[in-house]
C-alpha cells in the first residue's frame, strides 16, 4: 500500500442519519441515479459496507430545479387564465355585436354601457395576469442566471469543508482509537461511499495501526528483512515510527526466565516484544508468527489496493453515468425551455392575431354601421325629395285647378257681357226698326227717308263749312 493518506477522508453518513434519509428520499423522488455498488465485498474474511450521502450542492441544484418547475407551472396556469379571459372577452364582443344589430337606440345605449363595464373588467384582469406573468418570467430568468453560480459556489464550499473535517477527524481518531493486531485481523476495513468522495473508516484505522507500528506501510519489506536477520543477541533495533522492538539480555537462571518476561504497550497500543526467554526456538516461533501476520497484512493490503482500484473504476464509471444523465437532463431541460419559449411566442402571436382580428372586426362593424347610416340618410333624403316633389305637384295641381275655375268664371262673365251687349244691340236695332218702320211703309216715305238721310249725310260731311258759314253769318265783320 503506497501510503495511508488515501483513506484519510470523513464518513459523514453515520454522523447524521436523518440528513442521509432526507437526502436519499429527495434523490429517489427526483429520479437521481445513485451509485449501485455491491453491499458486501468479501476480501480476506472482512465485510465491506457501502453507504452513500448526497452533497449539499446536488440538493441546492434540485432546490433550484424545483423552484424553476414551480414557476413554470405558475406561468402555464397564468397563461391559461389569460386565454380564458380573452375568450370570454371575445364572446362578450360577439354577443354585444349580435344584440346591437337587433336593438333600438335606447337598448343599444344600455347594452353599450354594460358591454363597456364588462370589457373594462376583462381588460383589468388581463392586465393584472400579464403583470403577474412578467413577474414570473423575471423570477425564472433570475433563478436560471443566479441559481447555477450559487450552486457551484456552494459545492466548492462544501468540498472544502469536507476536506477540512476529514483531516480533523482523521487526526483525532488516529490519536484516540485503540488499535491492536488481533483487532486489525478480525475487523477488516468497511467501505462507505459518499458522493463525490468515498470513505474507508476501518481502513483508516488499519492504516494508522500500520503507520504507528512500523512507521509507514512502505517499511513492511524492510521489517521483513530485519526480522529474518533477527537474533536474540542482537542489539535493540528500531523500526521507525512510535513503536520499537527491544531484545533484552538473557537471564541467568530459570527463575529469571519465568519472571523476566514483560510486555508493555506503547502510546499507540502496540505490543513491544522483549527477550523474555532464553530459548531461540521461542523467539523463532514468535518471529514466524509475526512473519505470518505480516504476510496476512500484506495480502490484506493487496486486496485493499485491488478493492480501492475497483471502487475507483466503478466510481469513475458511475460518475460518468451520472454526468451523462445530468447532461441528458440539462439537454431535456433546455429543450423543454425552448418548447416553452416557442409556446409562449405562439400564444403571444395568437394574442396579437386575435387583437388584430378584433380591431379589424371593430373597424368592419364601424364601417358597416357608417354605411348603413349613410344608406339610411340617403333613403331619408330621397323620401324628402319625393315628398317635396309631391307637394309641388299638388300645389301646381291646385294652381291649375284654381286657374281653370277662374277661367270658367271669366268665360261665363264674358259670355254674359256679350249676351248683354247683343241684347243692347238688338234693343237698339228694334228701336231703330220701330223708328224706321213708319218711314218704309210706302214709296214716298222711302224716298223721303232717303233724301233725309242723304241730306243728313251731306250735312254731317260739310259740318265744318256749315259752322264757318254760320259763324260768318252770325258774327259780323
From Swiss-Prot:
Transmembrane residue ranges: 409-429, 450-470
Subcellular localization, as worded in the UniProt entry: Endoplasmic reticulum membrane
This protein's GO CC annotations: endoplasmic reticulum; endoplasmic reticulum membrane
InterPro entries: TEX28/TMCC
Region Disordered, annotated ranges: 1-24, 234-280
Membrane-topology annotation of the record: Multi-pass membrane protein
Molecular function GO labels: 14-3-3 protein binding; identical protein binding
Tagged with keyword Lipid biosynthesis: no
Modified sites of kind Phosphoserine: 46, 253
Top-rank taxon: Eukaryota
Family to which the UniProt record says this protein belongs: Belongs to the TEX28 family.
PANTHER family to which the protein is assigned, alphabetical: CEREBRAL PROTEIN-11-RELATED, TRANSMEMBRANE AND COILED-COIL DOMAIN PROTEIN 3
Full protein name: Transmembrane and coiled-coil domain protein 3
Organism: Mus musculus (Mouse)
Lineage start: Eukaryota, Metazoa, Chordata, Craniata, Vertebrata
